[in-house]
């Protein structure tokens, strides 16, 4: 028996006896190919149970509790991310524009996709939203999947240009350029999600000489499965394996560049005259190096978490598309992969704000400010000017970024209208 693949937006076509009422005789060979003769005597409920399975997904309660926890953390975290970037001018950097776009994608998944999937797990059939709702559901999941990976890839390219090619970054890493890139990202994501969307539709169970079974409508694959297999495997290759390989190479090059620069700067510091001069120069270099290393480390961890969270999703879809003969062992393995892929799919949408809070002092500060409500909170928290958003501390009390802004943010203050922009979200 072929297992169901609900978060793949498909149901196996061989579970459905046909898309229209069979005009052949009730005991014809075509009818016997799909239904047992006993099916004519079964009630509608028994037919639905036989061919569609239980109406409520097994393990619904524990999965529901897990999803609700992810929903709360992700909705609050991504909402705060969007809020602080919109409210604080100092946070409207090219890098943070990508993070804003990623947060919007995650919010779409959590606020629209997750409740819809929870409802379907509670009530697997009938699908109540019609053909339009089926198209929307499939398009949403596919589009945010593609938009997320394109966002993270574009962000990695931006970080590579900023670190390895700083002169080109002055003209390329600007807010206007990022807005154009993000427009292209979402446009490409929607365009590339259309093939999978077009393969889906609404099907109902039909019994020969009896007609459609009430309340059996399901949003599922309605085109040849070979087309779906090709789309899924191509998507996994072009929108997961290839981007992960590109990002791995980019961050390797970034790491090598930062290491080489650090060694050169240390050698230059040793050539300074007095001990006091070497100390001051070393302090400035530490701040410059710390700022770039911190943001690069945060974005690298974001990419790693992204890969971990999305790998089960693609493994789930590819496994369903390549296996033609299902044994009990494969069926059991797929069920485990399917549950894990669903949890990690939504966990990936909730993890990013947690990473920002843990690894970025600037995001952590603005998150606390956004959550701090009331006069009492204002009295308790230290006063921060907008300039404090670009301050970082090190082990030395002699180092203060306030006087070294051009070192920590070499792209700031040189681009006319972009004079206030910074490339680091930390």
From Swiss-Prot:
* Membrane side Extracellular: residue ranges: 1-65, 119-138, 203-235, 316-338
Task: State the compartments where it is located.
Answer: Cell membrane
Write out the transmembrane intervals: 66-86, 98-118, 139-161, 182-202, 236-256, 295-315, 339-359
The similarity comment for this entry is: Belongs to the G-protein coupled receptor 1 family.
In this UniProt entry, which cysteines form S-S bonds?
Answer: 134-219
What is the membrane topology listed in the Swiss-Prot or TrEMBL record? Multi-pass membrane protein
Question: What is the tissue localization of expression for this protein?
Answer: Expressed in greatest abundance in peripheral organs, particularly in elements of the gastrointestinal and urogenital systems with highest levels in testes. In central nervous system structures express levels are much lower than those seen in peripheral organs. Within the CNS, has been detected in highest abundance in the cerebellum, dorsal root ganglia, hippocampus, and spinal cord.
Output the Gene Ontology cellular-component terms: cilium; membrane; plasma membrane
Give the record's glycosylation annotations as residue positions.
7, 27, 41
What function does this protein fulfil?
Answer: Receptor for the neuromedin-U and neuromedin-S neuropeptides.
Name of the protein this chain belongs to:
Neuromedin-U receptor 1
List the SMART domains: 7TM_GPCR_Srsx (SM01381)
Identify the keywords attached in UniProt to this record, alphabetized.
Cell membrane, Disulfide bond, G-protein coupled receptor, Glycoprotein, Membrane, Receptor, Transducer, Transmembrane, Transmembrane helix
Protein encoded by which gene:
NMUR1
- Cytoplasmic side stretches: 87-97, 162-181, 257-294, 360-426
Q: Give GO BP annotations, semicolon-separated.
A: calcium-mediated signaling; chloride transport; G protein-coupled receptor signaling pathway; neuropeptide signaling pathway; phospholipase C-activating G protein-coupled receptor signaling pathway; positive regulation of calcium-mediated signaling; smooth muscle contraction
Q: What is its main location?
A: membrane
**Could you confirm whether the keyword Disulfide bond appears in this record?**
yes
InterPro entries in the record: GPCR_Rhodpsn (IPR000276), GPCR_Rhodpsn_7TM (IPR017452), NeuromedU_rcpt (IPR005390), NeuromedU_rcpt_1 (IPR005391)
Q: Name one GO molecular function term.
A: neuropeptide receptor activity
